[in-house]
């Protein structure tokens, strides 16, 4: 019988050893920060004293849960461990207060997709994570695009109302969540929102939300309905150069990721493509682990 525990910092070496069974697994580099989560985090599936599976549960919003990174030990795959572990994750997410649960699975992993669909999930979006490096910015940003200001709120609201079900990923490109106006205002106030065109009297046709540090620039959301995406990217390149950054990271829905790649005209490195599956649940209490 499987026993589930929430991983702690002292489990790090054990998790590293477990993930070593999987080739080129991105989770090897990502999992340590999940151990710091106050809610959710990494969950371990144990059969007696043997680690047979792990997964990540995150709550990017109080009512939204993300389930991802499920790994099942190769020798027990196909024996019902994945199904049982996935059912536990749904119950745990619901216990933590989620009413919307999203699972992220790699494209082509039909076994994982089947597990989640068997639990009532349905595919709602394709998701792409990747990096672009060594981009070259122009001397100055294109004046068509630039920072969003408080004066832009009304036309940003009008843009948002056309896409109320959009997803974004902040701060982690692997963890998609719903985008709200409060999210947009938060990035605007932090200096991490761009719009095009910048003319106040014109409708917004391109909006981007981003963050930048001394290592990379991360695009957390971008949507372009017109012809200004390239101009907006040129402004981003100028911003990145000012910080001495030459790496852009992103986690985006596939249509927007494809537009970004086309406008950047640069190869995407470490590209990962997957499916977002979603399920609505109630608020009935579940037993704690």
Where is each model-derived feature located?
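Short amphipathic alpha-helix that is part of the acyltransferase structural core
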Residues: 1-29, 136-177
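Active-site rim helix/loop that mediates acceptor-substrate recognition in acyltransferases
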Residues: 19-56, 164-195, 199
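Conserved beta-strand in the GNAT
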Residues: 44, 50-58, 66, 71, ...
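Conserved catalytic-core motifs of GNAT/GCN5-like acyltransferases
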Residues: 59, 104-105, 122-136, 267-280
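A conserved beta-turn-beta hairpin within the catalytic core of GNAT-like acetyltransferases
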Residues: 59-68, 77, 210-221, 269-271
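Conserved acetyl-CoA-binding loop-helix of GNAT-fold acetyltransferases
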Residues: 72, 78-92, 114, 118, ...
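Conserved active-site alpha-helix within GNAT-family acetyltransferase domains
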Residues: 83, 107-125, 254-270
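Conserved GNAT acetyl-CoA-binding A-motif
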Residues: 86, 92-108, 115, 242-253
